[in-house]
Amino acid sequence: KNGKIKTRRDLEVEKRQLCRDLKLNKFMSNADILETATIEEKGSISGLLRKKPSRTLSGVAVVAVMCHPHECPHGRCFYCPKSDIAPPSYTGEEPAALRGRMYEYHPYIQTFNRIKQLYSIGHPVDKIELIIMGGTFPSTDLSYQTWFVSQCLKAMVDFGIVLKNIEKGMKLKDITKDIIKEDPLYSNNILKTFAPTDYVILEDVQKANEISKVRCVGMTFETRPDWCKKEHVDRMLNMGATRVEIGVQTIHDEIYKKMKRGHSVKDSIEANRVLRDSGLKVAMHLMPGLFQRQKEDLEMFKTVFTNDSYKPDMLKIYPCLVTKGSELYDLWKDGGYEPYTDEEAVELIVEIKKILPKWVRTMRIQRDIPSTLIEAGVKKSNLGELVYNRLDEEGINCKCIRCREIGHKDKNYDFEDFRLFEESYTAVEGEETFLSFEDNNEESLAGFLRSEERRVGKECRS
């Protein structure tokens, strides 16, 4: 209140002193302070107390939940880690998988507790982007898919009721399931639940979520290209999809055959077309190091962003890793395969970042697999940081959306510093327009809108 605490360092110094003065048994966490703060106080201090502020820099909180362990219909890819405790392509030790295991992969419990955790460390949770992870979700039982999504949305609606009670003066720890059930939404039977699992009808909970204090503003599904046909995409749309991530991995049929992928380049291109025709945002996973070296991999990425069959809105770069239990592990042990080293991966991804267009977002660099489970390949978990450091050393500004977001810039701007830019390009039988609000040097991005005109009519994706 006296304005003494202005930085995180000031806060830590004051917390240590207060713990000594009060002879507390444990060091107070920021979550402890937020729990005791009033609504008005939270408004002024949450920014200072917020842990990992970049998580909600855009104003949207990302909540990733994982579906139950299952088998991919085609079998297992050559490089895929073997695990009985997680869905395909995961080891069970990734952060999202650990949370999934903790809550026995129950969608409601995963979603509710992740929102609660984010709220407790000072993040806004009024807008949620839900990411449903776990191999090929559209290949699971149809009733399971509907139940899973409805339970995630129900968790958001219920946490919205929690926020209403907090506004009335209650503490988060005191709000029980019985108190949630007293809300008019349930007591007036607006949202019907069915015993014994609190089952809700998807359409009912979607409607309830539209007016909830915790709304789902984005929903992402992970899938393979051969499980991204029109019927699969229509089903995802009905569940609320706004983005689909497809595991493209490579653009060469001969590599698909080597890795026992079970689909073709044609499937990847068709999946991209169906998703765009449906007005969905498209993220592609690409895996450098799959029986290719740096020169060939760089050419692959150049093709992805110049060939109209690809040109994704978003990109995840996952260098190929060797894990025990995979067929790739046996090949590596026999000397028949050698993945990228840390330095080779950094060099390649730096070159990739140099050629990225301004309309793509780099979502992730490197898998979340713990280094202790990686037998060979990139073991440094901060690969992305190493790439960005190298770009800084070379004085290179990556043009992708992620690198130019204004929230990541240590600079103050005036509205007059920005103007509207327009860039048009073609992709999969459609005309794309990328409208962006940027500074005059095109180095800081304040906002953007994607618009596309396709053969099925006009769609707007933002």
Language model region names:
Residues 55-63, 67-83, 113, 289-307, ...:
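Gly/lys/ser-thr-rich phosphate-binding loops in alpha/beta enzymes
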Residues 33-60, 170-209, 213, 370, ...:
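Flexible inter-domain linker/hinge segments
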Residues 93-110, 130, 134-154, 165-283, ...:
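Conserved non-cysteine loop/helix-boundary elements of the Radical SAM core domain that shape
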Residues 336-450:
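C-terminal accessory regions of radical SAM enzymes
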Residues 454-460:
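Conserved small/polar residues in nucleotide/adenosyl-binding loops
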Residues 64-66, 79, 131, 220, ...:
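Structured core elements
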Residues 70, 85, 249, 320, ...:
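Flexible loop residues that form catalytic
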Residues 1-110, 114-194:
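Flexible, acidic/Gly-rich N-terminal and inter-domain linker regions that tether
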